[in-house]
Amino acid sequence: MSSTQLFAFGINHQTAPLDVREQVSFPADAMEHALHDLVSHRPVREAAIVSTCNRTEIYCSTDKPDEATHWLADFHRLPTRELEPYLYRLPREKAVKHAFRVASGLDSMVLGEPQILGQLKDAVKSAEHAGTLGMLLHKLFQRTFFVAKEVRSSTEIGTNSVSMAAASTRLAERIFGDIGEQRVLFIGAGEMIELCASHFAARHPKRITVANRTVERAQALAHRLNGQVITLNELPDQLALHDIVVTCTASTLPILGKGMLERAIKARKHRPIFMVDLAVPRDVEPEVAELDDVFLYSVDDLADIVKEGLDSRQGAVAQAEAIIDSNVVNFMHWLESRQVVPTIRALRDQAERYRRHELERAKKLLAKGEDPRKIIESLSNGLTNKFLHLPSYALNHAAEDERDDLVDLISRLYHLHPSE
């Protein structure tokens, strides 16, 4: 039987700091290439990659898990020893449970947050498009989405949760008090920026500006917010005009450097700028935090705020874990039954060959005009002898130390009671 198994590995906000996570993230436009590289250069049959600001995880089907895990460092041109301390490896049942917990929001920085479910679905679509999603992973994610829906509909896991977007707004209010007098700049136009923009817009800031590489998408968001649009090229001149900056783009390199912020602060005559960088890899150079008049927060810095209200939801967590555990058992039953299918198929094929052989022999005897009753008797004897030959041979030739186990096994298979 093949030793190919379900396997998951990766890093997340619990095991690795931001400066490590950003080194192994996968931009959306590089996902297909990465998936092809993994299945082409490693003993991996199926693969899906989940890459968010808080995690990079690979779900795969492989018979050599160690080679699969080494790929992550190799692909990003990192020494394996540098990534090793932060990696988790989850074989079979642990991989299933982890997938269910992630989709249900139990493994998120924001407990119960719904965005991860959409991110998982995006990962599945990418794997489907790349042709790396086989039956095993398809079944896993199909069940994963079912479990996540059950958890969210049967528990209050998402109640009173503080999203990253809400946390950004709360932090801004702590620094400025009334956001209604502040000018807010959003860099990017993806889902996270849209969520943040909705929270800030509800506070009616003095002005909202959206900067994005694709102007059309920025215009659509700005229109909903009654804001204005600028291009990324205009950032050096426009930055000083804003009090609050929230950024989350898919750029692989920082777009806001220390020098640009120094010039902006000088132009603002040292009035403070509040910045939230929700991107991974980061949009803002970490050195910007060294500036006295810049309050820079990353996704990891928001952790304490998003944990507010966690104690009140421990009951919901216990309910969710129970739902997940039950579904893990069911999925493992399916997985284990799937692994014996080839053996069952081979057994049936062998029986079919016996049947056809005896049937053809009987037909030839009938064609010769021999007694049908004798032919039927001969056919039944032939089938009986063929079916019993191999187990009988195994019993007669078994080694002494394995004979008792073999007797027990055959007795159970054929419901025998030899001692009676």
Curated annotation (Swiss-Prot):
Pfam families per the UniProt record, alphabetical: GlutR_dimer, GlutR_N, Shikimate_DH
Residues that bind NADP(+): 188-193
Pathways per UniProt: Porphyrin-containing compound metabolism; protoporphyrin-IX biosynthesis; 5-aminolevulinate from L-glutamyl-tRNA(Glu): step 1/2
PROSITE patterns associated with the record: GLUTR
Entry EC no(s): 1.2.1.70
Catalytic residue positions: 53 (nucleophile)
GO terms, molecular function: glutamyl-tRNA reductase activity; NADP binding
Alphabetical UniProt keywords: NADP, Oxidoreductase, Porphyrin biosynthesis
Site keyed Important for activity: positions: 98
Source taxon at top rank: Bacteria
Residues binding substrate: 52-55, 108, 113-115, 119
Catalytic activity reported: (S)-4-amino-5-oxopentanoate + tRNA(Glu) + NADP(+) = L-glutamyl-tRNA(Glu) + NADPH + H(+)
GO biological-process terms attached to the record: protoporphyrinogen IX biosynthetic process from glutamate
Note: During catalysis, the active site Cys acts as a nucleophile attacking the alpha-carbonyl group of tRNA-bound glutamate with the formation of a thioester intermediate between enzyme and glutamate, and the concomitant release of tRNA(Glu). The thioester intermediate is finally reduced by direct hydride transfer from NADPH, to form the product GSA.
UniProt remark on domains: Possesses an unusual extended V-shaped dimeric structure with each monomer consisting of three distinct domains arranged along a curved 'spinal' alpha-helix. The N-terminal catalytic domain specifically recognizes the glutamate moiety of the substrate. The second domain is the NADPH-binding domain, and the third C-terminal domain is responsible for dimerization.
Function according to Swiss-Prot or TrEMBL: Catalyzes the NADPH-dependent reduction of glutamyl-tRNA(Glu) to glutamate 1-semialdehyde (GSA).
Assembly description: Homodimer.
Family (UniProt): Belongs to the glutamyl-tRNA reductase family.
Name the UniProt record assigns to this protein: Glutamyl-tRNA reductase
Species name: Nitrosospira multiformis (strain ATCC 25196 / NCIMB 11849 / C 71)
